[in-house]
Swiss-Prot record:
Listed cofactors: FMN
Compartment(s) where it occurs, according to its Swiss-Prot or TrEMBL record: Cell inner membrane
Organism: Salmonella arizonae (strain ATCC BAA-731 / CDC346-86 / RSK2980)
GO cellular component: plasma membrane
Membrane topology value: Peripheral membrane protein
Entry function: Regulatory subunit of a potassium efflux system that confers protection against electrophiles. Required for full activity of KefC. Shows redox enzymatic activity, but this enzymatic activity is not required for activation of KefC.
InterPro entries: Flavodoxin_fold, Flavoprotein-like_sf, K_H_efflux_KefF, KefG/KefF
Keyword field: Cell inner membrane, Cell membrane, Flavoprotein, FMN, Membrane, NAD, Oxidoreductase
Gene: kefF
Protein name per the record: Glutathione-regulated potassium-efflux system ancillary protein KefF
GO annotation (BP), single: potassium ion transport
Record-annotated membrane-spanning stretches: none
Residue positions binding FMN: 8, 14-17, 65-68, 105-108
Pfam annotation, one family: Flavodoxin_2
Amino acid sequence: MILIIYAHPYPHHSHANKRMLEQAGTLENVEIRSLYHLYPDFNIDVAAEQQALSRATLIVWQHPMQWYSVPPLLKLWMDKVLAHGWAYGHGGTALHGKHLLWAVTTGGGENHFTIGSHPGFDVLSQPLQATALYCGLTWLPPFAMHCTFICDDDTLQAQARHYKQRLLAWQEANHG
């Protein structure tokens, strides 16, 4: 099962993430958990989130990039849900053998995320990749949708279909 942990503080403003979720939602065995819908008060139900993670074989962290990082509720979710003794540390093997895909949208162009005057995309992904590996997850190459503020609807839809194809390819390769 694919579990999408979706974290967008302003979901009604995001055409890109909306298209991505619509495409992913057409696949079988996909569960979408919208953190800002479930926890507008930031009071996360840790047990429910851990149960959802336990059912998954592929976990997707989908969100817009905010200040070169994740939105605040996703960071809090990581702090609470990926608990010592459950996700890492002594006895913390609940996520071992599962895969993680980082699916991120950005307002900047792909060339904005190259080494030079801006941090490289590989550099920006390091904290998430380190978190995944620390929890025993297999890190997959990220899916990034760039220039989302200026893309026309056809371009957004095409990129969202590419996202769906990434998920479908993973399902077919992993019988999940």
